[in-house]
Swiss-Prot record:
Species classification: Eukaryota, Metazoa, Ecdysozoa, Nematoda, Chromadorea
Family: Belongs to the protein kinase superfamily. AGC Ser/Thr protein kinase family. cAMP subfamily.
Native source species: Ascaris suum (Pig roundworm)
Xref: PANTHER family: CAMP-DEPENDENT PROTEIN KINASE CATALYTIC SUBUNIT PRKX (PTHR24353:SF37), CYCLIC NUCLEOTIDE-DEPENDENT PROTEIN KINASE (PTHR24353)
Quaternary structure and partners: Composed of two regulatory chains and two catalytic chains.
Family matches, as InterPro entries: AGC-kinase_C, Kinase-like_dom_sf, Prot_kinase_dom, Protein_kinase_ATP_BS, Ser/Thr_kinase_AS
The protein's name in its UniProt record: cAMP-dependent protein kinase catalytic subunit
Location of the active site: D152
Entries under Pfam families matching the protein: Pkinase
Length: 337
């Protein structure tokens, strides 16, 4: 990348979606390359021919979605994202399907995964961790106001836009929870005790995961680790924490209050909700209006040489386009897609 001359990046042009016909026509886009892979699909960088704007196109094979019993999860992701609008949540523009795949069109987050930056630097400074935690708190406050539990907060699901601000992505596990839900889902090291114990859970699980994330950002590893899932789960249920001497005292206090095994005692899950987290001493210097309005200067400004730069993503082998059509009974599961 050092051999390329840096260009001035033009502001993105908004693609206009007809609110009465927000279906995606895949033929309107040129596929550039793969920027992510999953169990039943890929994410491509694509360019809209008419506007020359770049987007991320998520393509999921219908046969794989059904065989892996992810039908409800993908429906839920599309349904939730279509009604969410927040500066720290990825924007979904539209969706479509054919006899092979489901498609979802997202804004292109050229900065890549927060996970990549954390692994490269091993740890984040106290101020860096606080910046990202503050943006996450704003997003969680918004989601929880709509009774939505995100349920999969981790560095791999947090991406940076070209300015360096954070965006929550991958809403496959997100769910509207009026009372409690019992489905066990998420990443083992980030699961809350009530999920593991199958006691029913709600939005409180996100505050637990935030505690795990802050700890990992500042130490480089999650607080509960083990060689087996049972070992990890046992440590989570016990909830014993170890901190390095250099761990900021206010950050330590916040993490301990977020990682309360008893969900009724967990910060963020009490009467004043997210406001309790926002008012914690670790965030004393944070102006929450500035956070919400993206006025704070991000600690990491992604290196980009053009709007379609993919230098902040891993390289992937491109797969062939030989696809198998889904049978009619599977296609019927997505008639309202």
């Amino acid at each position: 990348m050092e051999n390329r001359e840096q260009e001035e990046i033009e502001p993105c042009v908004s693609i206009t979606i007809d609110p009465n016909n927000n279906k995606l026509n895949v033929d309107d886009f040129d596929r550039i390359c793969t920027i992510g892979t999953g169990s039943f699909g890929r994410v491509y960088l694509v360019q809209h021919r008419a506007s020359e704007q770049y987007f991320a196109l998520k393509k999921m094979a219908i046969r794989e979605v059904v065989s892996m019993r992810q039908t409800e999860h993908v429906h839920s992701e599309k349904r939730l994202l279509s009604r969410l609008s927040h500066p720290f949540i990825v924007k979904m523009y539209c969706a479509s399907w054919d006899k092979y795949n489901l498609y979802m069109l997202f804004e292109y987050l050229a900065g890549g995964e927060l996970f990549s930056y954390l692994r490269a630097s091993r740890t984040f400074s106290n101020s860096m961790a606080r910046f990202y935690a503050a943006e996450i708190v704003c997003a969680l406050q918004y989601l929880h106001s709509k009774n939505i539990a995100y349920r999969d907060l981790k560095p791999e699901n947090l991406m940076l836009n070209k300015e360096g601000h954070l965006k929550m992505t991958d809403f496959g596990f997100a769910k509207e929870v009026i009372d409690r839900t019992w489905t066990m889902c998420g990443t083992p090291e980030y699961l809350a005790p009530e999920v593991i114990g199958n006691k029913g859970h709600d939005t409180a699980v996100d505050w637990w995961s935030l505690g795990v994330l802050i700890y990992e950002m500042m130490i480089g590893i999650p607080p509960f680790r083990g060689k087996t899932l049972d070992e990890i789960y046992e440590k989570i249920i016990l909830g014993k924490l170890r901190f390095t001497r250099s761990f900021d005292l206010f950050a330590k206090d916040l993490v301990k209050k977020l990682l309360q095994v008893d969900r009724t005692q967990r910060l963020g899950n009490q009467k004043d909700g997210a406001a309790d987290v926002m008012n914690h001493k670790w965030f004393t210097d944070i102006d929450w209006d500035d956070v919400q309005n993206m006025k704070l200067t991000p600690p990491i400004i992604p290196t980009l040489y053009s709007n379609g730069d993919t230098g902040n993503f891993d390289s992937y082998d491109e797969c062939s386009d030989d696809e198998i059509a889904a049978p009619q009974h599977e296609l019927e599961l997505f008639e309202d897609w």
